[in-house]
Each structure stands twice: as C-alpha cells, then as structure tokens.
Amino acid sequence: MPVKRSLKLDGLLEENSFDPSKITRKKSVITYSPTTGTCQMSLFASPTSSEEQKHRNGLSNEKRKKLNHPSLTESKESTTKDNDEFMMLLSKVEKLSEEIMEIMQNLSSIQALEGSRELENLIGISCASHFLKREMQKTKELMTKVNKQKLFEKSTGLPHKASRHLDSYEFLKAILN
C-alpha cells in the first residue's frame, strides 16, 4: 500500500518569521584570532589604528633609522661600568652566600632534631650548598677569563675575532710586536 506523507508547514510559516530579530547571525570573523581560534576579550588588547600599527611594526617594515645614537658611542664606557657593577654585585653575592650557608646549616641541625626528611625534601638542603659554591666558582672563573681576554685585546691591538684566525706563528708575532 502506498503511504501518503505530507508536510504541514502552514503552521510553522508565519509572516514575521524572517524579521532580523529572529534570525541569528554568526559573530564577525574579525573578532576571532586566526592562530588560536579564540575570541578577543578586550577591544583594547591590540592596536587597531593604522598609526599604532606603523609604530608597532616600524622595524619590521624596513623603516629603520640609522643607528647613530650617542648611546652606541658610549657603549665601551658602559661595558666597563657594567663590568665594575657586576663585580660589586658578585662580591655582595659571595658575602650573602656565606650567610645562606649558615642558615642552611641551622636548618640541617633542625632537621636532625626533627628526625624526618620532609624539611630536606621541601628545601633541598642536602645539595644546595654544593651547587651554590660551584656556581660562584664558575662565575669567578668566567669573569677572570673575560678580563684576561679584554686585556689581551688591548695589549695586542687585535680584535677578538681576528685573533681566532691566526696560526701560532702569526699569534706569537702579534704578541711580540
């Protein structure tokens, strides 16, 4: 037997069913990030005006200015000042490291009184003192190497890169002259 099917759409169609208030529209694609697919939370999160975009991408848009700043000419003076400041900070760290070692010893004695390893696991008392001493020694060695290299460059008049490419004869000749 044939089955008769009919769609009763007359009740569903109304005259105002196509009003803009009833049609749900998708959000603008512009508000979504192409990399993450997430919606932008704030309108002020990234610059939207072209002037702000120019300032933000100035270097990448090949609008580079020549770098004749006075700060670049003073870079040699600032490196010596930075080196001196670094050495002063290093000496402060050495002094403070001794205090830290004393505090760690006190904590380890407290740990011995407690009889548990929870304090050691929490703070890491057992190996921290060795690491601190080792790092301080490495930093000192590196700073002395840097200072020796700078003194060598000043005495020979050769830049560091040029001294790398010399063979032993040219190196000795440069030192003697």
From Swiss-Prot:
One of its GO terms (biological process) is negative regulation of epithelial cell apoptotic process. It holds the Pfam family CENP-R. Residues 20-50 are annotated as: DD1. Induction: By estrogen. Residues 83-113 form a coiled coil. There is a cross-link at residues 8, 22 (Glycyl lysine isopeptide (Lys-Gly) (interchain with G-Cter in SUMO2)). A motif (LXXLL motif) lies at residues 9-13. GO terms for cellular component: cytoplasm; cytosol; inner kinetochore; membrane; nucleoplasm; nucleus. The modification Phosphoserine is found at residues 17, 28, 71. Keywords: Activator, Apoptosis, Cell cycle, Cell division, Centromere, Chromosome, Coiled coil, Cytoplasm, Isopeptide bond, Kinetochore, Mitosis, Nucleus, Phosphoprotein, Repressor, Transcription, Transcription regulation, Ubl conjugation. Residues 41-81 are annotated as: Disordered. A motif (LXXIL motif) lies at residues 172-176. The keyword Nucleus applies. A motif (Nuclear localization signal) lies at residues 63-66. The keyword Cell division applies. Residues 41-50 have a biased composition (Polar residues). It comes from the Eukaryota. Widely expressed. Expressed in spleen, thymus, prostate, ovary, small intestine and white blood cells. Highly expressed in testis and colon. Isoform 4 is expressed in platelets, lymphocytes and granulocytes. The DD1 domain (also called RepD1 domain) mediates the corepressor function and is essential in the triggering of apoptosis. Contains one Leu-Xaa-Xaa-Leu-Leu (LXXLL) motif, a motif known to be important for the association with nuclear receptors. Such motif, which is required for an efficient association with nuclear receptors, is however not essential. Transcription coregulator that can have both coactivator and corepressor functions. Isoform 1, but not other isoforms, is involved in the coactivation of nuclear receptors for retinoid X (RXRs) and thyroid hormone (TRs) in a ligand-dependent fashion. In contrast, it does not coactivate nuclear receptors for retinoic acid, vitamin D, progesterone receptor, nor glucocorticoid. Acts as a coactivator for estrogen receptor alpha. Acts as a transcriptional corepressor via its interaction with the NFKB1 NF-kappa-B subunit, possibly by interfering with the transactivation domain of NFKB1. Homodimer; mediated by the coiled coil domain. Isoform 3, but not other isoforms, interacts with the cytoplasmic tail of integrin ITGB3. The relevance of the interaction with ITGB3 is however uncertain, since isoform 3 is mainly nuclear. Interacts with CCNA2 and MTA1. Interacts with NFKB1 NF-kappa-B subunit. Component of the CENPA-CAD complex, composed of CENPI, CENPK, CENPL, CENPO, CENPP, CENPQ, CENPR and CENPS. The CENPA-CAD complex interacts with the CENPA-NAC complex, at least composed of CENPA, CENPC, CENPH, CENPM, CENPN, CENPT and CENPU. Interacts with TASOR. This is Centromere protein R. The gene is ITGB3BP.
